[in-house]
């Protein structure tokens, strides 16, 4: 489940590529963990839309956004843990 207000806890935007970082928590165990969604914005006539498919030239940017998301998550984690705990 995504966080209560359905907004990412952090976003990384590089050009049209966006990596959204979500904090999830188990209702049963209370365990917390981060997940990441990656999307690309594009314009279709007068509307902006998002897609999760990427063109060849998007891939280096996607790679960098994921690398930055990983670093941000790592900074949030307590020493000695691989995931966040509230």
Predicted feature locations:
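Single-stranded nucleic acid-binding surfaces, predominantly the OB-fold ssDNA-binding core
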Residues: 1-86
């Amino acid at each position: 489940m995504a966080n209560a207000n359905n907004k990412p806890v952090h976003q990384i935007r590089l050009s049209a590529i966006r990596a959204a970082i979500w904090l999830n928590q188990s209702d049963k165990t209370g365990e917390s963990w981060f997940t990441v969604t990656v999307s690309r914005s594009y314009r279709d006539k007068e509307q902006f839309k998002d897609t999760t498919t990427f063109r060849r030239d998007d891939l280096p940017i996607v790679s960098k956004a994921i690398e930055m998301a990983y670093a941000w998550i790592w900074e949030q984690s307590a020493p000695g843990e691989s995931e966040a705990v509230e």
